[in-house]
Amino acid sequence: MKRYDDLVEEALARVKEVTPWDFGRRYQSGDVPLLLDIREPSEFAALHIPGSINVPRGILEQSCEWDYDETVPELVQGREREIVVICRSGKRSVLAADVMQQMGFSNVVSLKLGIRGWNDAELPMEDAGGNVVDADAGDELLASRVKPEQRKPK
């Protein structure tokens, strides 16, 4: 049986990553590819990279194809376009980028360390209303909230 981290590790052999620091410099220079945030809508609404689009991981595959309720034309038409996939910690984005590559996307990378790393680098973030979210607020919003019953028994 494979665990989640095993799946991520396998996908990392096939997926390129870009660090928040390297991509942040490029982003701030105005050279911005398609930013695809695959977190859940509530996560995205709380904070995201300005200019990113939200397509939750659970509907990603349908969003990349025509004729579905979830179809996102920008994605369907973007198979040759440079795409940076974003999640909270950089794991879901690796799995999503791997699937997108299998679906014919030729220039897709995962944001290493996810939006957490972006926040740690104190790069621009906003909420659903377009209000700036500073790094301290980002720390609070991105803090792990694993409950005792969710932890592995000892």
Describe each region flagged by the PLM.
Residues 1-33, 41-82, 91-154:
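Rhodanese-like catalytic fold shared by cysteine-dependent sulfurtransferases
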Residues 36:
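Active-site flanking residues adjacent to catalytic metal/cofactor-binding acidic residues
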Residues 86:
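Short, surface-exposed ligand- or partner-binding patches at beta-edge/loop junctions that are enriched
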